Amino acid sequence: MRLVIAQCTVDYVGRLTAHLPSARRLLLFKADGSVSVHADDRAYKPLNWMSPPCWLTEEPGGDSPVWVVTNKGGEQLRISVEEIEHDSSHELGVDPGLVKDGVEAHLQVLLAEHVQLLGEGYTLVRREYMTAIGPVDLLCRDESGGAVAVEIKRRGEIDGVEQLTRYLELLNRDSVLAPVKGVFAAQQIKPQARTLATDRGIRCVTLDYDKMRGMDSDEYRLF
């Protein structure tokens, strides 16, 4: 990960346009290719960002070089750097991801044992399928043999959908697995998360943990 604190202006050029006037900002360049621009507020949310895959080039601009981040759709973040206060790179390695709480971990075990809950003809390939950005909870095959990545949460929120989206973007670059579909499974799924998942072609499945624990395997069903 590269961390840059700089006085800069930022312009987004794509389907829309957006301009951030000159200010001191934190620029994050991550190993997965993503680039994000942060201010000293908004919690974890960036002012602007570019999701991978994207590419960074530099255009000469005299005293203010322009860093151009371009994604596969041709959209650009154009960062005009006026002054760099800090620039450092750090090797973080592969993150093990969040440690699931007891309910999430048990949901993963139960769903792996009874993967037909996801649909007739589903089979399990592997639990904790490792990727460069962390493990996918379940990798399955559907009734037609297509690969399906499953993210399991106790409470399904937007962050979980974003996490699954990143996994899908990466897995779909693998010519052996692609195309890979996504399933977002949780005890409760917030409306905003469901809307975002549906917009991205991710199927949502609501699980009843208590009934999954108490029923025989041939009585499992979705609610």
Swiss-Prot record:
<keyword id="KW-0540">Nuclease</keyword>
<keyword id="KW-0255">Endonuclease</keyword>
<comment type="similarity">
    <text>Belongs to the NucS endonuclease family.</text>
</comment>
<dbReference type="InterPro" id="IPR002793">
    <property type="entry name" value="Endonuclease_NucS"/>
</dbReference>
<keyword id="KW-0238">DNA-binding</keyword>
<keyword id="KW-0963">Cytoplasm</keyword>
<dbReference type="InterPro" id="IPR049173">
    <property type="entry name" value="NucS_N_sf"/>
</dbReference>
<dbReference type="InterPro" id="IPR048302">
    <property type="entry name" value="NucS_N"/>
</dbReference>
<dbReference type="InterPro" id="IPR011856">
    <property type="entry name" value="tRNA_endonuc-like_dom_sf"/>
</dbReference>
<protein>
    <recommendedName>
        <fullName>Endonuclease NucS</fullName>
        <ecNumber>3.1.-.-</ecNumber>
    </recommendedName>
</protein>
<keyword id="KW-0378">Hydrolase</keyword>
<dbReference type="GO" id="GO:0003677">
    <property type="term" value="F:DNA binding"/>
</dbReference>
<dbReference type="Pfam" id="PF01939">
    <property type="entry name" value="NucS_C"/>
</dbReference>
<comment type="function">
    <text>Cleaves both 3' and 5' ssDNA extremities of branched DNA structures.</text>
</comment>
<dbReference type="Pfam" id="PF21003">
    <property type="entry name" value="NucS_N"/>
</dbReference>
<dbReference type="GO" id="GO:0000014">
    <property type="term" value="F:single-stranded DNA endodeoxyribonuclease activity"/>
</dbReference>
<dbReference type="InterPro" id="IPR048301">
    <property type="entry name" value="NucS_C"/>
</dbReference>
<dbReference type="GO" id="GO:0005737">
    <property type="term" value="C:cytoplasm"/>
</dbReference>
